[in-house]
């Protein structure tokens, strides 16, 4: 299978209908499925000439923010035969170089030139802005590209620095299979279908506030086209723009990360004095019937509020390596750990500490199935996955019900869905070796947290050690800043290797009721 199938079943499914609505200033514009397909062909013919002498099968990076024709550029590259790597537009230059080395990327379609020697840079605005009549009307200069070259692979990358970011490759059949599986779940869920406002699915507009290069944002857009829904672009990705668009354009479904939902809750409380059904209708409109949260875990307080919002709220779980995997209504189970049931035809097992696999219980979630990633790009070559995938996440499986309990790997997932690696943050605070008997950073309550046993515990906040912590923290990127600090009178526990036992910190906090200081770093200008 090639990505022609995905195009045919998504944008091709919107012929005769509006596929996208967007804004130029305050003016709303529409793009039909027919017009989008025509523009894809024009961009394909243009790129076929522009990308010479790159051969079909070459990896090309699409590194640009969300835009109306972002998917069109991707499909045009694929129709030329190029395998596409989807990158964050904000990635630093070092990460671009990393993927050139590790993935063999030969060109970037981007809004910011990389300037990497020997690598082609193409401005995405140049591609998106081609004139359909000019390109399609000049077959001599821009020979038509047929359907005989379609690419069969796409790559998504994980968060991290140059040493941890990985490029995961998915076969076209895995992506198409996922889209079909999600559609089957969606159309078979009576709680969703009974909330339709019209027989015309085009009127059920969907607003998605995730970057398209993110596997969740990618899959949701193509899935809603697959089901016949119009996708609407807000004027910008800010929370107030999303609120205004949702209300004014009668959005029916919205997909966001937990951080965005928490923002809506705060704004509803500030504007209307509450977060009940009436307040949410005032904030987001009466047509919003279905909401989805994914990318990170919803906190218990948000779940409590959202249960009373009068809108069907779904929680979803997935990873870059597996795409989307589970989904379920937050009102279907009293546990805030509940993330629904498997619906992407994954085969799931629990790996216990003794190395045995069971169908039910608590342990590391292990998945297999066709819709997982196929390979990783390392050193310019594909290293293929062998056997099931160990997620690194602790789950409880109880029949068809799934409960996400936390991470057994060190990565911290913020409520915006971003991966933060504590080992990287530890390096910034290595001066603590001179001021303490031990320290580490870890994820605690979805926050970047510093644990330290200072030599001067009693006067810790007046010491040079604490002043240096504040100074270093102030210079860190916003997403890596420590937001909470725990100082311990007694030494921190260590592993058999003599390292601070990062994974035991949550348990240590529960057990040590004395000799612990909690210091919130927010509001300290750090």
Residues covered by each model-derived region:
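Conserved AMP-binding A3 loop
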Residues: 32-34, 153-186
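Conserved ATP/PPi-binding loop(s) of AMP-dependent carboxylate-activating enzymes
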Residues: 341-342, 356-387, 401-402, 416-420
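Conserved AMP-binding/adenylate-forming
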Residues: 46-91, 207-210
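Conserved AMP-binding/adenylate-forming core of the ANL superfamily
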Residues: 20-53, 61, 65-67, 94-97, ...
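Conserved AMP-binding/adenylation subdomain of ANL enzymes
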Residues: 179-205, 212-279
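Gly/Ser/Thr-rich phosphate-binding loop
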Residues: 252-256, 266-334, 436
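AMP-binding/adenylate-forming catalytic core of the ANL superfamily
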Residues: 108, 369, 392-480
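Conserved C-terminal "lid"/linker of ANL adenylate-forming enzymes
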Residues: 412, 470-526
């Amino acid at each position: 299978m090639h990505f022609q199938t995905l195009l045919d079943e998504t944008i091709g499914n919107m012929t005769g209908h509006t596929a996208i609505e967007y804004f130029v200033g305050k003016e709303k514009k529409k793009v039909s499925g027919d017009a989008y397909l025509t523009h894809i062909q024009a961009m394909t013919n243009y790129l076929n000439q522009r990308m010479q002498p790159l051969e079909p099968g070459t990896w090309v990076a699409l590194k640009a923010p969300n835009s109306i024709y972002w998917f069109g550029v991707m499909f045009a590259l694929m129709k030329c035969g190029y395998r596409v790597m989807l990158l964050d537009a904000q990635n630093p230059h070092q990460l671009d170089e990393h993927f050139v080395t590790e993935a063999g990327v030969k060109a970037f379609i981007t809004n910011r030139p990389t300037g990497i020697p020997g690598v082609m840079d193409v401005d995405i605005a140049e591609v998106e802005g081609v004139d359909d009549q000019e390109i399609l009307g000049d077959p001599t200069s821009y020979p038509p590209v047929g359907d005989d070259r379609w690419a069969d692979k796409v790559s998504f990358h994980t968060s991290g620095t140059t040493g941890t970011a990985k490029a995961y490759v998915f076969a076209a059949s895995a992506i198409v299979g996922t889209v079909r599986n999600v559609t089957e779940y969606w159309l078979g869920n009576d709680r969703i279908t009974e909330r339709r406002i019209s027989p015309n699915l085009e009127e059920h507009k969907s607003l998605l506030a995730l970057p398209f290069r993110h596997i969740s944002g990618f899959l949701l857009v193509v899935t809603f086209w697959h089901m016949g829904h119009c996708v609407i672009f807000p004027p910008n990705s800010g929370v107030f723009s999303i609120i205004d668009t949702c209300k004014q354009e009668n959005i029916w479904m919205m997909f966001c990360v937990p951080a965005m939902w928490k923002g809506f809750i705060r704004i509803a409380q500030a504007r209307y004095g509450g977060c009940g059904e009436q307040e949410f209708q005032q904030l987001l409109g009466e047509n919003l019937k279905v909401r989805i949260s994914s990318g990170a875990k919803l906190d218990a307080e948000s779940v409590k509020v959202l249960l009373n919002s009068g809108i069907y709220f779904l929680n979803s779980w997935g990873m870059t390596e597996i795409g989307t995997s589970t989904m379920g209504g937050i009102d279907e189970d009293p546990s805030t750990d509940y993330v629904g049931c498997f619906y992407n035809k994954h085969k799931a097992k629990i790996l216990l500490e003794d190395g045995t696999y069971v169908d039910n219980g608590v342990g590391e979630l292990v998945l297999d199935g066709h819709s997982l990633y196929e390979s990783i790009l390392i050193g310019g070559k594909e290293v293929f996955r062998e056997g099931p995938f160990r997620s690194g996440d602790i789950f409880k499986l109880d029949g068809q019900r799934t409960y996400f309990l936390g991470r057994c790997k060190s990565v911290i997932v913020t409520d915006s869905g971003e991966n933060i690696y504590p080992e990287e943050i530890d390096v910034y605070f290595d001066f603590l070796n001179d001021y303490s008997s031990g320290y580490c950073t870890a994820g605690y309550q979805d926050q970047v947290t510093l644990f330290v046993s200072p030599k001067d515990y009693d006067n810790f906040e007046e010491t040079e050690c604490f002043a240096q912590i504040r100074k270093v923290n102030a210079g860190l990127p916003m997403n890596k800043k420590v937001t909470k600090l725990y100082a311990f009178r007694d030494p921190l526990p260590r592993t058999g290797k003599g390292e601070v036992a990062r994974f035991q910190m949550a348990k240590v906090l529960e057990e040590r009721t004395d000799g612990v200081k909690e210091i919130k770093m927010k509001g300290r200008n750090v």
